[in-house]
Amino acid sequence: MVLSQMDAGKALTAAAARGNTSMVQRILEESRVHPDTPNEFSMTALQVMMMGNSKIASLLLEKGADPNVQDKHGIAPVHDAARTGFLDTLQVLVEYGASVNIPDKNGALPIHIAIREGHRDVVEFLAPRSNLKHTNISGQTAIDVARALCVPDMIDLLFAHIHS
């Protein structure tokens, strides 16, 4: 498979978006494309990958993908993993250096998003690693988001981490 860098970038992002692990691996190995090569929409494979496929995340990160790459809205893969609730993918991203304290353009950290989406296991993972005093553009901390959404179990979980 001989592809130009641009074509290889398109093929890589398409395979990652479809969750095609074997094709992602093949493109990375045979075309020697850098995993951060963007597609025609300026998105990398890590940004468009099927979040439920932690194996693809591992392949891309092992080959040097930037775990903190952000789109024009400040959304990083950790925000997407927190939003969709894929803890295994989030763990891989963090293992490879993704920051859990990277804000999007609204100032939301991944923990704010996980609380909003109701992903308790993700919140449990993020709480000891996150800056729980960080406020979004509305001035809300993670606990404030949980209070606004009336989720007492998340409020308790966050208080436990603050007072530990």
Where are these regions (language model features)?
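Ankyrin repeat structural motif
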Residues: 20-28, 53-62, 86-94, 119-127, ...
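Intrinsically disordered, low-complexity regulatory segments in ankyrin-centric signaling systems
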Residues: 1-30, 40-43, 164
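Ankyrin repeat A-helix N-terminal signature
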Residues: 14-20, 48-53, 80-86, 113-119, ...
